[in-house]
Each structure stands twice: as C-alpha cells, then as structure tokens.
Amino acid sequence: MDYRIEKDTLGEVKVPFNVYWGPQTERSRKNFKIGPESSMPIEIIYGFAILKKAAAYTNHELGVLEIKKRDLIGKVCDEIIDGKLDDQFPLVIWQTGSGTQTNMNVNEVISNRAHVLLGNKLGEGEVFVKANDDANKSQSSNDTFPTAMYIACYKKIIEVTIPGISKLIQSIKQKSKEFESIIKIGRTHLMDATPITLGQEFSGYYSQLEYGVKSLKNSLPHLSEIALGGTAVGTGLNTPKGYSELVAKYISKFSGISFVSAKNKFEALAAHDAIVESHGALKQLAICLNKIANDIRMMASGPRSGIGELIIPSNEPGSSIMPGKVNPTQCEALTMVCGQVIGNDTAISFGGAQGHYELNVFKPLMSSNLLISARLIGDACQSFAENCINGIKANKKKINQFLNDSLMLITALNTKIGYYKAAEIANKAFSEDITLKEAAISLNYLTPKEFDDWVDPKNMI
C-alpha cells in the first residue's frame, strides 16, 4: 500500500505513506493544482521554521508547553532551516490567500517528523507533538504567514538585493573615476546638448542607485514589525500574557535580524503596506536600472553605424546568421528584469488593496512577487557589474568626433555675442554643412582667435 490513512476535521484522507505532511496538506495538494508544484517559495517555509521554533521557546518560557515538546519542535525546525526537509513542502502559491494550508503543511511536518524522531513509524500510534495544539500553539495562520513572509522578504533584501546593488554601485563608481577626464557631448531629448564628461554621466548612474538603496533600506523598519501574537483578528486571542514581545525576541535571536512586535496587530493582519512599500523601492530601482541599461546600450550601439562611444565586452556571439555580431546582452537581460519587477509591482499593488476588514487574503501573491523581484534585482545587478560595467571601455575617437562636430558648442557664445547671433551661427553651420568656426567667421561675428578662446569644451563642463 503506497498510502496511509490520516484524519482531519473533515474526515479521512489518503496521504502518501512516506511523507511527513498530513491530511490538510494533502487536501490542498489535490485541490489546488495550479501552476508548478511546490511553487510556494522555500524562503517562506524557512521563515515559518524560525517562527515555529521561536513560538515553541516562548510558549515553554511562559509555561504553556513542556520542554520535551519545545526541544522536538526546535529540532525539526532546525532541520527545515538547514534544507533537509525541502521536499516535504509541495504546496503552491495559488491557494487560500491567508496561506493557511502552508501553515498547516509546516505544522504537520513538525508533528510527523517529531513522531519519527521519537522512534515511531509514520501513521502508527498517536503523535506526541500535535500539529494544531503544539506546533501551532498561540498562533493562527493569519499571524504566522505574514510573519514568515516578512522574515523571508527582509532576509532576501539584505542578503541578496542590497549586496548586488552595492556591487554595481562600486563598479560604476570605478568607471566614473576612470572616465573623469573624457569630455563628450551631452544629449537631451536624444539630441545634441552641451559637453559633459563621461565620468559625470556615470556619476549620475551611481547616484540614482544610491537613492534607490536608501529607499529600500528605509522600508526595512516597517518590514521588521511582525504580526505574530495577533492570532486570528489581531486581538491576541489564545496567547499567554507577554507572548508577542517575547516571541519577537526569539525570532530575532534565531534569525540574526532584529524583529519587533507590530505596534498595531490589526494593521499587521489586515494590511501589508510594508510589502507595498519595500516593493515600491524595488520598482524605483528597476526604473533606475532600466535607464542605465538603455543609456549604455545606446552609447555602445554600432559598432560602425551607431553611436559607438562605449565599447562593451564581447561575451558571446550575437547572431546565428550574421558573423561577427555582438549584442548588448547584459543590458537586454537587465531591462527584462526591470520589466518583470515593474509588472510584479502592479500585482503587489492590487494585492495590497485586498485587505477586507480584518485580513488581507493576497499574502502568497504579494510575498512571492517581492521575493522574485528582490532576487532578480540582486542577481541582475551583480551580473551587470561583472559582465558589462567592469569591462566597458571608452571609444575616444568616436567621442571626440561627436564632440567636435556638435553644433551645441555654440552655447558657450551666449554670454559673448548673445543668444540670437549664436543661433544664427549654428543654423548656418547646419544648413551649409560647415563648422561652427567657419560659420562664425563668415558672418563676421568672431575672429578665429576669439572662437578658439571662447568655444572650448574644457571650459564648458
């Protein structure tokens, strides 16, 4: 027989004989065959393990859970955190919006794994650690899932996203320093403008990213406020006195991150503005990164029929039909990531608006999208730094050609001969395809020496 019979409040359920999950997990596995199996992010499962262990220690300290059960729950949770039980969490994102089935998946795994650790066989005899009464003691799905997702999202941001962005910032800063003396023509509206150094242009990029990281870091305090202790609707029903504050301390201890009990549990259950806020910062970074990637690939366009001011690394052949073609693939990958993050933000915004009365029921959607975005931005920034920015070179020949040919150098004459005479020189140079100097001299507005003294790109930056 390849299954065992387990019971829940709705009756008997056939559960695969060799798995640690139980009847409620199996019901969900059968009822929600939507998308890939096991799509619930494993980071959320690890967040659950941290909070379940913290709850067990808190419950014991407050006198409502015996030490043997505390230690068994803690041991199983450590196994989960270490990745030893990853295959025991088969549920999908697309389930109940409170994440109840995933909460019960974790509870059942804790219960049955503890049963085996005590020397018993799955499905035989009464379990010592009960899924609802012990693993879920002083808890509700309504306060555990938001706590698990905040732990997961916070960890992903500080462990993956911020380090990736920081690496890219440093790479761009190094290039800005390297390019600080290279004068090029600036562009506004995609048209020629006044001169700028390539280093100044790159300084704008890393400054944008620094503001984005600042926004992301500023969102973390809200994300550190956990709902655990609010139980079903925020009142804390069925929790011992002092539970909320103590469990937050244990979560901080076991996660290595400072978490605090949410000031208002009703807000913590019914709204997830912390997710909206943090992902808003990720969207800000995506918008910034999209601008940077587009600028770089346009400046690298060519190599002979485009702008060609930058030379980007030749990482791989670019065409199956055109020999020798190399494409700005890192820029393309990064802009696709940006599009995905901006799309995820739309879903999160919609999900954040679905807090009806005392509970938001879009928790799996919101948390999974943030985890995806946080990972994508962190990974993409690191890849872009290593495989594009670090290898960029300036094409000084092209840069000088465009600089010297630009009509917008005439702007330097505004304070010498006035805007209208300067415009007349520029228009004549353009219409007759001659240089600015030739046009200025032919109009008798300047001497050759005056032009050379006044129209000098080095004095315009």
Please report, for each region that a protein language model flagged, where it lies by residue.
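Conserved, well-structured ligand/cofactor-binding cores
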Residues: M1-I461
